[in-house]
Amino acid sequence: MDKEKTLLTLNSFNKNTLMETLKIEFVDVGVDFVTAKMPVNSAVHQPYGILHGGATAALAETVGSCASALFVDTKTKIIKGIELSVNHLKSKKEGTVFGIAKPIHKGRTTHLWEIKVVDENEQLISICKITNIVLDKK
């Protein structure tokens, strides 16, 4: 896997999407993980001035779905998230959070990923799981 080329490809998918709005950027990829970062500021706050759970969920779904896409032939297959769970463990007011997706199961038709959302000090903010379905392109 060409890491730099893969990161460029992943980041190219963000243009004109929610990921671009949230400033999500893929920053690392390996044989068994994908990492993306998102800034925490007023743009992703909820009314109490902390990171909105929906923004965290968007980061988790983004990194988990894109991780699945790395393991299929995207010329013939598409990935769709069918379940997302997010447990928020700690709040975050400002800085950066990182979504790190690691596989739990990579089957022929379904993938299950664990996504840990941590801050720049490696404090666990949220723990997430996403189930993706692998479908034939029509």
What annotation goes with each model-predicted range?
Residues 1-138:
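Terminal targeting signals and extreme-terminal segments of soluble enzymes
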